[in-house]
């Protein structure tokens, strides 16, 4: 991957709307160091949409939702990939790049969904529902993916379910994503009990209050939100779909019912749009910082490894998804 990296000084013009000067003065040393380290080490940084603007807009080479990062990870030709996101994303990057070094800056960057289910849980579901295909959300460990028939993201879940041509499908582990997909298809969806700790806190009452306070506001919801929230929203979709919606429709005022940094990152691209922010922070995503990205590149921390037997089966489930 080749690119001319701008200086950190010019980068501030891009993010000044969401990063005050006093904060920028704290970030700039790490940003300069990271830009230099990437060149020296032939490294790229993949950043999820929930990363803070100083990471997303200033040091990342590839950005996007889980599906976009999975697709783009396959095209990376650098020797080192730093995943600015949570652990399952780093594992997915490693699955798709087994011969590259994949680093995650903080091993504690987990996910409530990934922690809600184990490989043994999937095996028990298979015993309970024999011959029913298992669709596993990418927000899971490699061990869980290895027990699955195919993976999905919030951006392609409906297409994945339809691609199986089955009357019944097990969909793990996000209960609300499964219910929201079930509302769009005649396929019977058997759900698990996992929930995203960020999205489960949004309520339909939140939306009604927003509409009362901001008449005419456009409400966009993530499909990990409860079904009643999705029903109240003007649009529901993945973070990439939300970003595309804002770019296409240019609403005067909008609220994104998702993680806080998403609004900041989209606002950088659309200064003409007024973003209302009743968001929820993801404590796991916020464990990734400029400081630990810099340390990851300086000290080669933390290298992602996956058991080869698990990796082979998990890779198949992820790659099958990418061909849908």
UniProtKB/Swiss-Prot annotation:
Q: Where in the cell is it found?
A: Cytoplasm
Q: Which InterPro entries match?
A: NadA, NadA_sf, Quinolinate_synth_type2
One GO cellular component term of this record is: cytosol
Q: Which GO terms describe its molecular function?
A: 4 iron, 4 sulfur cluster binding; metal ion binding; quinolinate synthetase A activity
Main location (coarse class): cytoplasm
The entry's function note states:
Catalyzes the condensation of iminoaspartate with dihydroxyacetone phosphate to form quinolinate.
**Protein name per its UniProtKB record:** Quinolinate synthase 1
What species was this sequence derived from? Answer: Mesorhizobium japonicum (strain LMG 29417 / CECT 9101 / MAFF 303099)
Its ancestry begins with: Bacteria, Pseudomonadati, Pseudomonadota, Alphaproteobacteria, Hyphomicrobiales
Designated gene of the protein: nadA1
């Amino acid at each position: 991957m080749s690119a001319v990296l701008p200086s950190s000084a010019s980068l501030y013009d891009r993010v000044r709307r969401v990063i005050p000067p006093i904060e920028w003065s704290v970030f700039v040393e790490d940003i300069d160091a990271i830009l230099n380290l990437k060149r020296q080490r032939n490294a790229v940084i993949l950043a999820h949409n929930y990363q803070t603007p100083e990471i997303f807009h200033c040091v990342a080479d590839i950005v996007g939702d889980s599906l976009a990062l999975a697709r783009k990870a396959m095209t990376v030709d650098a020797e080192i990939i730093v995943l600015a996101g949570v652990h399952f994303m780093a594992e997915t990057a490693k699955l798709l790049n087994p011969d590259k070094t994949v680093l995650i800056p903080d091993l504690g960057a987990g996910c409530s969904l990934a922690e809600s289910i184990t490989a043994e849980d999937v095996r028990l579901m298979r015993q309970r529902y024999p011959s029913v295909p298992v669709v596993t959300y990418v927000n899971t460990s490699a061990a869980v993916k290895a027990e699955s028939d195919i993976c999905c993201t919030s951006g392609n879940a409906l297409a994945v379910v339809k691609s199986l041509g089955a009357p019944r499908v097990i969909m793990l582990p996000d209960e609300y994503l499964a219910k929201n997909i079930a509302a769009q298809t005649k396929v019977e969806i058997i759900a698990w009990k996992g929930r995203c700790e960020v999205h489960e806190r949004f309520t339909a009452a939140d939306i009604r209050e927003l509409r009362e306070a901001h008449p005419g506001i456009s409400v966009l919801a993530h499909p990990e939100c409860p079904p009643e929230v999705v029903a109240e929203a003007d649009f529901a979709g993945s973070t990439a779909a939300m970003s595309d919606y804002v770019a296409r429709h240019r609403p005067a005022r909008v609220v994104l019912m998702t993680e806080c940094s998403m609004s900041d990152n989209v606002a950088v691209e659309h200064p003409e749009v007024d973003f209302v922010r009743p968001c929820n922070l993801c404590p796991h995503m916020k464990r990734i910082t400029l400081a630990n990205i810099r340390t990851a590149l300086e000290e080669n921390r933390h290298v992602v490894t996956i058991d080869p037997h698990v990796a082979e089966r998990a890779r198949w489930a992820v790659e099958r998804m990418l061909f849908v």
